[in-house]
């Protein structure tokens, strides 16, 4: 299959795409710069991203209201959205402790979780699945074991999966959020903390209810969603590139080539689309332009990682065999100078395990489109290794996947426009981030344990 990606708007009317983009541009306001752009290339992106004054996370950005709305409850204690200070440092240290562990231990836990899910897939026929949906329960169980250091019970796995799916569905504007569904996980985590079931020392600056929200946001939202998305991207890329898949299947212990496949996938389909920061001081953009304090800087990962590579739109894992590729723009886990992903070490380890586990059991095939956002949740045919399906049946299934994908693209695009507009307007009305930072300092001291009020309940959805 060709390495050229099909346009993201296949069958989708250009007017709908343009309208959707305009809706989200309105959220940012006027004091916004997106990097890289026509005037400022990847070198400016890197310099500004690493500038010490580009460290604001939520306060002062209209976009923060939307992200807090999507991620509620507990956005105010989510590690990604905490402002610099003692509270952030304590939360970040806790996350590092929970993620700490041997590579072998992480690999074993991930392999066990993925195998448990794959055991439910029949081996006597071809299965049509959505890869993100298939693997999200595995990463829910993996995250549970990280936090609680014990196997994940089915009830907890279902709660985590339902929560994570609700968050990512809202983020992609393919569905509205369901606060009650998320609240069930919050209540469960609160009960586990009260019972003393968490073997890690949780941040002392957080109240017990905030500790539950911290675990929910960092591990059972972000970790589960990002690992599910990453695995779906890698497997869908393999399904669409049979020669690459065949090479991996024939040489399952080739760590170097598998690393190249993962790198190429995360280069072409970065998990982060736009990361925004707020300047807390003046930041020079070029010789004549200085960004004032309070400016919102949006860092476009897809645009940045498309620079410095030959044939940037082509899926080519072999490009990473060239040492020069390592010097090209590529930051799958962010930049070291500005809060990189805390799972930068663990993620590649467990991703490799998951990919190998799937390929050891199934051959993958997909005619669905592949875009960075993957709103279709990665449709894919799983063909059990011992099975040799009839050519006509397999081709019929491939045609069905292609046709359904095209039809869904039209309806999904319109749905994203409508639901995205609804959520943008709702977030602007609620103003969860803005209202939080407008509260008197005594109501949101980074050390005190604020009591839940009507305002905070509304803020958390």
Locate predicted features.
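N-terminal targeting/anchor module and adjacent flexible "hinge" preceding the catalytic domain
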Residues: 1-40, 394-461
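Active-site substrate-recognition loop segments, prototypically the cytochrome P450 B′-helix/B-C loop
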Residues: 1-154, 453-457
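Cytochrome P450 heme-thiolate monooxygenase catalytic core
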Residues: 103-229, 431, 435-442, 446-452, ...
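Cytochrome P450 catalytic-core helices
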Residues: 224-251, 342-362
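Conserved cytochrome P450 K-helix E-x-x-R motif and the immediately C-terminal K′/meander segment
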Residues: 252-289
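Conserved cytochrome P450 K-helix/beta-meander segment immediately N-terminal to the heme-binding cysteine loop
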Residues: 300-324
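Cytochrome P450 heme-thiolate "Cys pocket" and heme-binding signature region
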Residues: 320-377
């Amino acid at each position: 299959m060709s390495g050229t990606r099909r346009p993201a708007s296949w069958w989708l009317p250009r007017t709908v795409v343009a309208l959707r983009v305009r809706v989200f541009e309105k959220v940012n306001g006027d004091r916004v710069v997106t990097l890289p752009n026509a005037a400022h290339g990847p070198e400016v992106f890197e310099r500004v991203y690493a500038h010490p004054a580009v460290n604001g996370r939520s306060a002062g950005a209209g976009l923060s209201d939307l992200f807090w709305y999507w991620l509620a409850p507990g956005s105010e204690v989510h590690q990604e959205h905490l402002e610099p200070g003692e509270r952030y440092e304590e939360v970040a240290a806790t996350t590092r402790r929970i993620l700490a562990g041997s590579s072998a231990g992480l690999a074993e836990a991930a392999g066990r979780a993925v195998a448990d899910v794959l055991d439910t897939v029949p081996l006597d026929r071809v299965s049509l699945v959505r890869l993100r949906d298939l693997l999200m329960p595995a990463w829910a169980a993996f995250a549970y074991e990280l936090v609680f250091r014990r196997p994940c019970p089915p009830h907890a796995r279902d709660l985590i999966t339902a929560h994570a799916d609700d968050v990512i569905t809202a983020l992609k504007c393919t569905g509205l959020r369901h606060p009650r569904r998320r609240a069930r996980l919050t209540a469960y985590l609160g009960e586990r903390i009260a019972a003393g079931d968490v073997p890690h020392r949780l941040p002392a600056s957080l109240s017990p209810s905030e500790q539950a929200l911290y675990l929910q946001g960092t591990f059972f939202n972000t970790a589960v969603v990002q690992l599910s998305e990453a695995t779906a991207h890698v497997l869908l890329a393999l399904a669409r590139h049979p020669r690459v898949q065949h090479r991996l299947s024939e040489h399952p212990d080739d760590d170097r080539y598998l690393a190249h496949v993962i790198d190429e996938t995360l280069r072409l389909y970065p998990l982060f689309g736009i990361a925004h920061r707020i300047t807390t001081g003046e930041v020079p953009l070029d010789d004549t332009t200085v960004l004032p304090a309070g400016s919102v800087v949006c860092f476009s990962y897809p645009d940045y990682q498309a620079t410095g590579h030959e044939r940037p739109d082509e899926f080519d894992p072999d490009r990473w065999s060239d040492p020069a590729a390592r010097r090209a723009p590529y930051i799958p886990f962010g930049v070291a100078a500005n809060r990189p992903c805390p799972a930068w070490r663990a993620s590649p380890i467990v991703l490799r395990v998951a990919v190998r586990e799937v390929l050891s059991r199934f051959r993958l095939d997909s005619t669905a489109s592949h875009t960075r956002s993957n709103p279709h949740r990665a449709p894919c045919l799983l063909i059990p290794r011992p099975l040799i399906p009839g050519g006509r049946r397999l081709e019929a299934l491939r045609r069905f996947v292609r046709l359904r994908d095209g039809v869904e693209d039209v309806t999904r695009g319109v749905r994203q426009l409508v639901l995205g507009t609804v959520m943008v307007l709702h977030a602007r009305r609620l103003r969860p981030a803005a209202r939080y930072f407008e509260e008197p300092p005594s109501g949101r001291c980074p050390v005190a344990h604020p009591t839940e009020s009507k305002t905070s309940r509304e803020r958390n959805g």
